[in-house]
C-alpha cells in the first residue's frame, strides 16, 4: 500500500491542494 501511495502522491496532491499543502511541507522537510 505504501508503494501505491507514493505513486499516487502527485495525483491526489493536485486533487487535494488543502491536504497537499500539509504533505508538501512534510516532503520538503523529509527531502
Curated annotation (Swiss-Prot):
InterPro entries: Amanitin/phalloidin (IPR027582). Processed by the macrocyclase-peptidase enzyme POPB to yield a toxic cyclic heptapeptide. POPB first removes 10 residues from the N-terminus. Conformational trapping of the remaining peptide forces the enzyme to release this intermediate rather than proceed to macrocyclization. The enzyme rebinds the remaining peptide in a different conformation and catalyzes macrocyclization of the N-terminal 7 residues. There is a cross-link at residues 12-16 (2'-cysteinyl-6'-hydroxytryptophan sulfoxide (Trp-Cys)). Residues 1-10, 18-31 form a propeptide. It comes from the Eukaryota. The keyword Protease does not apply. Keywords: Thioether bond, Toxin. There is a cross-link at residues 11-17 (Cyclopeptide (Ala-Pro)). One of its GO terms (molecular function) is toxin activity. The keyword Signal does not apply. NCBIfam families: amanitin (TIGR04309). Major toxin that belongs to the bicyclic heptapeptides called phallotoxins. Although structurally related to amatoxins, phallotoxins have a different mode of action, which is the stabilization of F-actin. Phallotoxins are poisonous when administered parenterally, but not orally because of poor absorption. Belongs to the MSDIN fungal toxin family. This is Phallacidin proprotein 1. It comes from Amanita bisporigera (Destroying angel).
